[in-house]
Amino acid sequence: MVGVADPAAAPRIAEVLRLLGTERAFVVHGEGLDELPLDGTGVLYDVSPDEVARREIDAQALGLSRASTSALAGGDPATNASLLEAVLRGESGARRDVVVLNAGAALLAAGRTETLESGIELAALTIDAGLASELLGRLRAEKRRADAAVAAAPQPQGASA
């Protein structure tokens, strides 16, 4: 799934992906964002080797809350990490809704579900079961191990840290 903020660029990128022989991909944008929005209609370009199909996505029609882009605003990296952790711990609200909407679309693009609705449901269940938070913890642990391995690796002759 590729997010594109520029509505004019999104169909062009989708067509390039098709021409490159992409098996399945989604190019999404909405209301100036590089993701599907909660405050209006988002657009999803469904890319396959044969075509690019344009689909409008209305989050409210999918049972999600309506929220302005400003209500979803984050901040610096530490703030954004904290906001994501809260969603992955099960906090409800607009931030969770935008996460499950976009994760649901990614699950559909990856062939894990048959419909966007079932993708949203699977994303929500994954959060509610604690699996998303658990995965984030495993990714962090793996990053720490990789960082330690890099730091412990011998430096090439003449290299400076």
State each model region's role.
Residues 1-161:
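Glycine-rich anion-binding loops and their surrounding alpha/beta cores
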